[in-house]
Each structure stands twice: as C-alpha cells, then as structure tokens.
Amino acid sequence: MSAKKTAIESLMGERGHLRTSHEMLKAALEIESRDDSFVPFYIATANYMEAGMGRLDAQDVRMLSRLAEKLGNMSNDEEEIIAEVHRRLDGNRDHLKKFLTCRDALVADETDQKNIANFESVSNAYIDYIHNSMGHHAPSTDIAIKLFDDNDWNDIADIDPEYFSGEQKLYVTQLAVRPDSVPLGKEAAEYVAEYRRDREE
C-alpha cells in the first residue's frame, strides 16, 4: 500500500491479520478429512492469537478509558455502551484462557487424540464467540471516531516495531504449517484498503 498508514489504519490492519488467522482456523475445523498433520497449524494459530488477542485487549482497554475521559459526565446509554464492550472483553479473556490451555496440552502431546478433540471443540466455541461478540462494529467505535484526534489514536494503537516484527514471525510460521486444504485469508493491507474505501463513500 503506497500511502503511509494512520494509527487507526494500523489498528485495522492488525485486526485484519487477527481475523484472517482465526478464519483460517475456522476453515480448518470445517474440513472433514482432518488428521494429525493439522496439529502444528493448530499450535501456530494459537500462538498467533495469543499475541494478537492480548494486544487487541490492551488497545480496547485504552480506548475505553480514553473514551470515558472524553465523554466526562456520561449518559446512561453511554455508560452502557462502554460497559457492554468490557463484558465482551471479559468473555474473550475467558475463552482465550481455555483455548490456550488446550494449546498447551497439544504442545505437551501432539498425538493424543483427546487433546486434539478438546482443542477443536474449544476452538469452535471460541471462534463462535469472536464472530458473535467481537467481530461486529460496536457503537463505542463510532463515538471514538467522532471524539478522538490523531494523538488519541496514536496512544491507543501503540505502534511498536518490535511487536510487529514478532507478530510477523508468528504469522509466517502459521502460514508455513498451514495444510494445503486450508484456504488463505485476506492480507492485512486488504482490510486497510477496505477501511479507506468505506471512509471515502
């Protein structure tokens, strides 16, 4: 992408990569002819999502804190909008903890069929939660876009070259062990391009 990304576009790109990661996992779990060769992909995906979801959580907490500061004396509706996102984040942390526990069991024994079945079951539940509770545009984001300036978005995005370097390595590892039958998702740049098009309409 030729133009330099803004902080909010960096956020969109990060979340696009994360979405691609869990959508590839969803696609893998829908393949009937799965076998033990999928396990390295499961582990690599969990490693990527551990980093990505941890960062998403920290960014969203900063955004909600800044939003509360900007709003000041909030209405009941505004308080509920922020509280609802906190509830989603709490649920995401609970699912992520279970997901990573299953990942750790797989790392300890990649051939144990019970470990594989548990990981797949917990992964399906987690992906359902992400799609139903984390994947749609929240009213808090609309308010933030109206109230925040570039400095706010820079603080929230916390653009960190060291993190991006590590994230890229995790993503490359995930792709390297992706079974051929699992389709590739979109690149982060495609999500940023979509965001730019939406802003122009």
What does each model-identified segment do?
Residues M1-G54, Q59-E201:
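Small-residue-biased structural context
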